[in-house]
Amino acid sequence: MSRSIKKGPFADASLLKKVDAQADADKKQVIKTWSRRSTIFPSFVGLTIAVYDGRKHVPVYITEDMVGHKLGEFVPTRTFHGHKSTEDKTTAK
C-alpha cells in the first residue's frame, strides 16, 4: 500500500537539513544517512547520498528518474551469490 496523499511524502528532518546545507555550500560532499525510508525530493537531484545497507554506506548519485522513490530502493541489503549450478553438485552413489 502506498502512503496517503493527504499526508504527503516523508523525508527525515536531519537529511533535509543536510541537503539544504549542501545546496548553500560551494563544494559538493557525500551526505551520509541511515534513513532508507526517506522519499527522494527534486532538491536532492545532483547530490551523492551514502545510504546505509546494514554493513556500510553505499554512495548513490541522485538523478531525476529517482524522484518520488525511497532511498532504500537503490541499495540492496542482502548479497545475492547466485544459485548453485548443477555442475558443482556432487552425486553420492
UniProtKB/Swiss-Prot annotation:
One cellular component (GO) term of this entry: cytoplasm
Alphabetically ordered keywords of this record: Ribonucleoprotein, Ribosomal protein, RNA-binding, rRNA-binding
Pfam families cross-referenced by the UniProt entry: Ribosomal_S19
PROSITE patterns the UniProt entry points to: RIBOSOMAL_S19
Alphabetical list of InterPro entries matching this protein: Ribosomal_uS19 (IPR002222), Ribosomal_uS19_bac-type (IPR005732), Ribosomal_uS19_CS (IPR020934), Ribosomal_uS19_SF (IPR023575)
Gene Ontology MF, one: rRNA binding
Superkingdom per UniProt: Bacteria
Gene Ontology biological process terms from the UniProt entry: ribosomal small subunit assembly; translation
Cystine residue pairs: none
Similarity field: Belongs to the universal ribosomal protein uS19 family.
PANTHER family attached to this UniProt entry: RIBOSOMAL PROTEIN S19P FAMILY MEMBER, SMALL RIBOSOMAL SUBUNIT PROTEIN US19M
Purpose of the protein: Protein S19 forms a complex with S13 that binds strongly to the 16S ribosomal RNA.
Protein name: Small ribosomal subunit protein uS19
Species for this entry: Lactobacillus helveticus (strain DPC 4571)
Annotated gene: rpsS
